[in-house]
């Protein structure tokens, strides 16, 4: 009787697989969803999924890659935490608010993904992307999804090639000798003479609905190999600085090329200064400016980026103070009215610039529109949440304490990265 029941279940699975094949062969469009699991109760690093990595919330890196890949009919973040939900929506994702039953420490990824599938019956293919994969690029997702949509696989997962010699674990203090698991110690191969082993790197797992209903992997499965530079593990605090350096070099920074930035607009109050205005006994107004920040401005100017300091009607600067700042920084200082966005657009029109050519540094609610529209944007560490959510980069430094220098270095790093890529593309074109 048990055998008959097993055959019946197998028959059901075969029917599902044949149905998926019919859809593929007929060219019928299947709904493909990206799903990032981001529970609030991370044990290794508290709220790790929205901790800022290289100026971007961790889940922002994979959400940017998923959205820009243009492969998904919907992009989702599954969470049980209000702050993660806010960040997810800011980065263009829909939110699956998971139930308490799948939000426990003991809950598995499969439990959550199956709940998501039940609540979204229109979804045919789920691409489960790990939030801890900040070096993921759109082309990785596109190529892996084609293995499902064009090659007929029902389960695809990412791997990386490792060249690690593994040994059997034995009890400490015991007399049992360890044994090699994947090598002959008498004939140790050189790295270049050994193909290594394929290991899951956890970047993503893609499954058809039929597959996910019976497990995370199954059916006709395949691996998608990623290069080591794109494979990053973030589990404990010590991984964070390593991942930050890796993502600055190999991360995906978006569709717009950062080298086109021609102009930086930077707020004086709350960015270049700490927001305080000191008044002398004679009534003279003074502000404190960090020399690191003024050096950052000069670094940009030397690279051909114009820097204009701006002040809103709510933070008026005296003419003497504005002149002093202009002289010290070598920048024009402009006083803007209440319509900051409108005046910035007029300024861009005068200079024949587009938003992607503008970097904007703000610090509060009036700056949100410009922070959203600018090709690059940033806020100091101590900016309010409304501004942080709108900015593309969140500084580690506070206002008046190096935030402008940090953002300047970020702009220059992206320009250098883009210039290097352009040079590499030129070499490839000339060679081939």
Swiss-Prot record:
* EC number of this enzyme: 2.7.7.43
Reaction(s) this enzyme catalyzes, per UniProt: an N-acylneuraminate + CTP = a CMP-N-acyl-beta-neuraminate + diphosphate
An annotated GO BP: N-acetylneuraminate metabolic process
For this UniProt entry, the molecular function terms from Gene Ontology, in alphabetical order, are: keto-deoxynonulosonic acid (KDN) cytidylyltransferase activity; N-acylneuraminate cytidylyltransferase activity; N-glycolylneuraminic acid (Neu5Gc) cytidylyltransferase activity
Disulfide bridge map: none
Q: Indicate the transmembrane segments per the record.
A: none
Q: Which residues form the active site?
A: 188
- Major subcellular location class: nucleus
Give expression by tissue: Expressed in testis, ovary and liver.
The answer to whether UniProt assigns keyword Nucleus to this entry is: yes
Superkingdom of origin organism: Eukaryota
Sequence positions that bind substrate: 39, 49, 98, 107, 109, 130
> Would the keyword Magnesium turn up in this protein's UniProt record?
no
Q: In which pathway does it act?
A: Amino-sugar metabolism; N-acetylneuraminate metabolism
Under Gene3D superfamilies, the record lists: HAD superfamily/HAD-like, Spore Coat Polysaccharide Biosynthesis Protein SpsA, Chain A
Q: Which UniProt keywords apply?
A: Nucleotidyltransferase, Nucleus, Transferase
The record's annotation in InterPro entries points to:
CMP-NeuNAc_synthase (IPR050793), Cytidylyl_trans (IPR003329), HAD-like_sf (IPR036412), HAD_sf (IPR023214), Nucleotide-diphossugar_trans (IPR029044)
Q: Which Pfam families match?
A: CTP_transf_3
Q: How is this protein annotated for GO cellular component?
A: nucleus
Subcellular location(s) per record: Nucleus
Which function does this protein serve?
Answer: Catalyzes the activation of N-acetylneuraminic acid (NeuNAc) to cytidine 5'-monophosphate N-acetylneuraminic acid (CMP-NeuNAc), a substrate required for the addition of sialic acid.
Quaternary structure annotation from Swiss-Prot or TrEMBL? Homotetramer; the active enzyme is formed by a dimer of dimers.
Q: Which PANTHER family match?
A: HAD SUPERFAMILY MEMBERS CMAS AND KDSC, N-ACYLNEURAMINATE CYTIDYLYLTRANSFERASE
Identification of the protein by name: N-acylneuraminate cytidylyltransferase
């Amino acid at each position: 009787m048990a055998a008959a029941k097993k055959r019946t279940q197998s028959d059901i699975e075969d029917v599902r697989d044949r149905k998926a094949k019919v859809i593929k062969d007929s060219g019928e469009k299947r709904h493909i969803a990206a799903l990032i699991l981001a529970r609030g109760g991370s044990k290794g690093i508290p709220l790790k999924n929205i901790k800022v990595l290289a100026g971007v919330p961790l889940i922002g890196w994979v959400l940017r890659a998923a959205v820009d890949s243009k492969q998904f009919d919907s992009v989702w973040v599954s969470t049980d935490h209000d702050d993660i939900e806010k960040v997810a929506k800011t980065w263009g994702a829909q939110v699956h608010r998971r139930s308490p039953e799948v939000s426990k420490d003991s809950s598995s990824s499969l439990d959550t993904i199956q709940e998501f599938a039940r609540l979204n019956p229109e979804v045919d293919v789920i691409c489960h992307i790990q939030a801890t994969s900040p070096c993921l690029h759109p082309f990785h997702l596109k190529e892996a999804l084609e293995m499902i949509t064009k090659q007929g696989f029902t389960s695809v997962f990412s791997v990386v090639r490792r060249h690690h010699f593994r040994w059997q674990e034995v009890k400490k203090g015991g007399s049992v000798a360890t044994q090699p698991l994947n090598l002959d110690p008498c004939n140790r191969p050189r790295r270049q003479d050994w193909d290594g082993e394929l290991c899951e790197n956890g970047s993503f797992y893609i499954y058809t609905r039929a597959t996910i209903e019976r497990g995370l992997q199954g059916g006709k499965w395949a691996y998608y190999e990623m290069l080591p530079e794109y494979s990053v593990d973030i589990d404990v605090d010590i991984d964070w600085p390593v991942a930050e350096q890796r993502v600055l070099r190999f991360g995906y920074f978006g569709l717009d090329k950062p080298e086109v930035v021609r102009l930086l607009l930077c707020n004086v109050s709350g960015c270049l200064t700490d927001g305080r205005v000191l008044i002398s006994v004679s009534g003279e107004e003074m502000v404190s400016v960090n020399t690191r920040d003024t050096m950052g401005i000069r670094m940009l100017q030397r690279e051909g980026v114009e820097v204009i300091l701006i002040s809103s009607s709510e933070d008026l600067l005296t003419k003497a103070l504005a002149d002093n700042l202009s002289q010290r920084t070598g920048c024009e200082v402009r006083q803007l009215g209440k319509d900051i966005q409108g005046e910035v657009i007029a300024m861009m029109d005068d200079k024949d610039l587009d938003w992607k050519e503008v970097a904007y540094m703000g610090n509060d609610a009036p700056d949100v529109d410009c922070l959203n529209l600018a090709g690059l944007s940033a806020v100091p560490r101590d900016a309010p949440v409304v501004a942080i959510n709108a900015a593309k980069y969140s500084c580690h430094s506070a206002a008046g304490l190096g935030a402008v220098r940090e953002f300047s270095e970020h702009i220059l790093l992206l320009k250098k990265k883009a210039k290097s890529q352009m040079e590499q593309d030129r070499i490839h074109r000339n060679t081939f």
